[in-house]
Amino acid sequence: MINKIPKHEIGAESKAISKIVFDTVELAKNHFEIVKKRFLDVNSWELFAGKNKAKFTLRNQEGELILNQPKVGNYISIEVPLLPNKDKDHFEWVKIEVYEEEKKEDYEAIYIRVRPTSNPTNATDETVHFLDSKATSNFFIRRNEMEISAEIYAINEIPNFEDKTISEKIRNKAVALGGMLFGSKLQWEGLTDGLIRREK
């Protein structure tokens, strides 16, 4: 599934990878079931990422909160701390464009790819996100025998200046550059660590 990640061509890129190894395949299989539940509960990602991180909410094509397993065509609204955008609900928006699962005896994985998009509750198709729609975030969880990993690859990250006012451009550049330099990596490392963490 790693070959599903779009080629990096422009802007910044980053990755966060967290791994955990178990003593037996059976223990790894059991824990991966927990990891899957966490991963597929998008509305709880902020709990796993830690304090003062972005809030993620899974939504349908009307922009309404949903509690289902994510699928292609669903939206995710993102509430960025400190610097909300000027849209009416202050959310950043991404859309799920790829969802795949793979399961074999010694290997299983789930892959989700999202891309900045418009607000589904607005009439315009203007991208409502601090990053340009060329950017993608690629989320993996996988079990390879006794090893479990959670991985996030952020690709082609450039600020979104499409049809923006000067103040919006400044805001998007500030948030995007902050994310490129340190924010996104801290956000994603918190999430990957939280997704695979052993329960006490």
Task: Identify the function of each model-found stretch.
Residues 100-117:
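Short, solvent-exposed secondary-structure boundary/capping segments
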Residues 1-72, 81-88, 126-200:
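Mixed-charge, low-complexity intrinsically disordered regions
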